[in-house]
A protein has these predicted regions:
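Long, low-complexity, charge-biased intrinsically disordered regions
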Residues: 1-198
């Protein structure tokens, strides 16, 4: 471990989702991170609520298809640039090596920079898939074929909507997206950011 580095503690969070699914998350106690040592930047863009409303209104006017998906464990995909060390999680410490620590390479929930690391990874992946990021809202991505926007992707942390006039193209794009991340395909979107979609 590098000199001057602090070891961050962690804890388990147990949760029951609205659908009854039981989840467990390992959460880093990021409040103990030191700015300038453990992280520099923490801001990560999220889609503006007004932009979501506008995009859904345009989709409604154009009679577009709207498909949803949920990216599982999003922050675990964000590659870290900083050196972060964490204590071994309770119940997973290696017997006889409890004094050793883990060097984190990817984000975990609770890290100050986890959201930014995920967004940077997502942004690069979307560009690799052929999307362009909207300049006015960094969580709206446009996919064009023959100069015409064919799919609009709206991403809010781990939730995404894919909207467009052609369901076949949307499904192709969704399938390509899901090759990059472990996702739960929600099919035709019924809800996004607590808004009902009909």
């Amino acid at each position: 471990m590098a000199k001057g580095r602090k070891v961050i503690n962690n804890h388990w969070v147990f949760d029951v989702k609205p659908d009854g699914c039981k989840c467990t998350h390992l959460v880093v106690k990021g409040f103990s991170q030191v700015e300038g040592i453990d992280f520099d930047q923490v801001f990560s863009p999220v889609v503006q609520f007004e932009t979501v409303c506008l995009m859904l209104a345009l989709a409604s006017i154009g009679n577009w298809h709207i498909e949803g998906l949920d990216v599982r464990s999003t922050y675990l995909y964000g590659k870290l640039d900083e050196e972060i060390y964490m204590k071994q999680p309770k119940g997973f410490a290696v017997k006889g090596q409890e004094h050793k620590v883990l060097h984190l390479k990817y984000g975990l929930y609770g890290l100050k920079q986890a959201g930014l690391a995920w967004w940077e990874t997502l942004n690069k992946s979307m560009k690799d898939l052929g999307f362009e990021c909207l300049k006015s809202d960094a969580s709206i991505f446009l996919y064009k074929r023959k100069g015409t926007t064919t799919v609009v992707a709206i991403v809010y942390i781990d939730d995404a909507l894919f909207c467009g006039p052609d369901i076949k193209t949307i499904k192709e794009i969704k399938a390509a997206f899901m090759k990059h991340w472990e996702c739960r395909d929600l099919g035709p979107a019924k809800e996004f950011l607590h808004m009902n979609i009909q």
